[in-house]
Structure formats: structure tokens, C-alpha cells
Regions:
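Electrostatic interaction modules used in gene-expression and signaling proteins
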Residues: 1-19, 143, 147, 151, ...
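Winged helix-turn-helix DNA-binding recognition segment
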Residues: 113-173
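Short recognition helix of helix-turn-helix/winged-helix DNA-binding domains
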Residues: 1-132, 241-265
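Short low-polarity hydrophobic stretches
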Residues: 106, 133, 137, 186-188
Length: 266
């Protein structure tokens, strides 16, 4: 039943995707505007998960270049050298397309300065589960992806040294020592951003910094949400966040070397 419910949520996201695209076409037609390509996929567009009012919105400008880089990998294996060198499956175009699409979903939910995958909130960066990211895949591409296929793409990214994750285990206060888990910390590496090459383009770097400043003005924080917040008051949490804080600092230095940043107090 649990798996069936998850699959049903993904199917709903696929429907929302198609409804949102249809609504956007109707909106443009009513304004007399031409539309030649309303794909979401590797563009800076995003579909909001709103069944009652399906809608297409725009992500910040930097995502146009970043997600285009993901699409380029499909026909150009050397676009991401570490994947090309260390993951033999990348010789297959279908495998590259899988990785490119999963990358697009991860990156559209990533703070581009720290490399943290999640959602910035006033309490901090909220972790996202792989199931949530699979639903985002359905919203972005309008198609179903099997959890096993999504997991393969993640494995390839880790094998290339591009992506890291750390489980969050929570000991419950049930007297039996039961352990539950929360969505893992997920993090892109400095190597990934070096291969992505976003800092080579001043307009992209400037847009990334502008996005961070705008979010900070809105009161959003980009450090991981506190352990207590994740555990929601349970007694003990077993995790290793220090490693990911150092990775985030290292990733941030890539941007600092290119475009001076003021330290983020959040």
C-alpha cells in the first residue's frame, strides 16, 4: 500500500505537469503570444505542485545555463569528465540521459554556493527525500522514473565523486531503542562544480550571488536545519554533519575565488 501511494503521488505530478503546460499555452495564446517550445525539462522553468491551479514559473536566471549543461552531457560524455572517466556505464547514451535528467532535478533544488540539496527556510536548509526528488522529476519531465533507476543515477554521481549523502538516524523514545531515519543530507562536491564550470561565466556567478542575497533578505538560511528541528524533539540523533559543513565551505570557496562574497551569517 505504501509503495502504491507513492506511485500514485508521482502519477499525480505527471498530470500536474501536463495540465500546467496546457494552461501556460492557453495563457500565451490569449495574449496573442507565439510559443514554439514549452518544455520544462532542461530549462529554467518549473512546475508548481498545485493540483487546483497548475502553473509554470521561472527559476532564477542562472538555472538556464546550469540545466543546459546537464542536457549537453547526453550527447557529449566529456561534458562531465569524472563521469566519463570513472563510470563505464556512461558509454551508453541512455545511461547519460538518465543521469542528465536526475542531475537537473537535483540541481534545481540546490543552493549553488554551498552545494547543499534541499529547501532553504527561515530555520535552515531543509533536507529532501529521494521520493520527493522523484516527484520533482515527474513535475519537470512529465514522466515516471522508477526508484531503482533514480538510485542508479545517484550511484553513478557518487562513483564520479560528484555527490555525497549522509544518513540521518534518529533514536526514538519508545523504550525499545528503535531507530528511524529522516531524509539524508545531500551535497554536491567541489569537483562537480569545477566540472560544471559555472564560475567561468561572470553573468552566471553574479546571478547565483544575487539569488543568495535575495533569499537572505527574505530571511532564508542556507546552513542545514538544526538537528533538533529534524528530529522534532526526539532524544538522540546519530549523524555526521561536520563532513558536509566542510564540503559546503570548500564548494563556497570556488565562488569566492571568482566573485568576492561577504560571509553569510546564516
Amino acid at each position: 500500500m505504501y509503495r502504491a501511494n507513492r506511485k500514485a503521488r508521482v502519477r499525480e505530478c505527471i498530470e500536474i505537469h501536463h495540465d500546467a503546460v496546457a494552461a501556460e499555452k492557453a495563457r500565451l495564446k490569449a495574449k496573442g503570444k507565439a510559443f514554439t517550445n514549452l518544455e520544462i525539462g532542461f530549462t529554467k522553468r518549473r512546475v508548481l505542485r498545485d493540483k487546483k491551479n497548475p502553473k509554470v514559473i521561472n527559476l532564477p536566471l542562472e538555472f538556464a545555463t546550469i540545466l543546459k549543461g546537464c542536457e549537453e552531457f547526453i550527447d557529449n560524455p566529456s561534458r562531465f569528465p569524472a563521469l566519463d572517466i570513472w563510470v563505464s556505464e556512461m558509454r551508453n547514451r541512455q545511461a547519460r540521459e538518465l543521469v542528465a535528467k536526475v542531475l537537473a532535478c537535483l540541481l534545481s533544488n540546490t543552493d549553488m554556493i554551498s552545494g547543499r540539496v534541499g529547501k532553504p527556510t527561515e530555520a535552515g536548509m531543509k533536507t529532501l527525500s529521494y521520493y520527493q526528488l522523484q516527484e520533482d522529476y515527474a513535475l519537470r519531465f512529465g514522466e515516471y522514473i522508477a526508484p531503482k533507476s533514480f538510485g542508479k543515477a545517484i550511484k553513478y554521481l557518487k562513483q564520479a565523486g560528484y555527490f555525497h549523502s549522509e544518513a540521518i538516524n534518529i533514536r526514538m523514545e519508545d523504550g525499545e531503542g528503535a531507530v528511524r531515519s529522516a531524509p539524508a543530507y545531500k551535497q554536491f562536491s567541489e569537483r562537480f562544480f569545477s566540472d560544471l564550470k559555472v564560475v567561468r561565466y561572470s553573468n552566471v556567478a553574479e546571478s547565483i550571488v544575487a539569488t543568495r542575497k535575495r533569499q537572505m533578505k527574505e530571511g532564508l538560511r542556507h546552513t542545514w536545519v538544526s538537528f533538533r528541528e529534524i528530529a522534532n524533539g526526539v532524544r538522540q540523533i546519530f549523524l555526521n554533519a561536520n563532513k558536509f559543513e566542510s564540503i559546503a565551505e570548500s564548494t563556497g570557496r570556488v565562488f569566492e575565488a571568482y566573485l568576492p562574497l561577504h560571509p553569510n551569517p546564516h
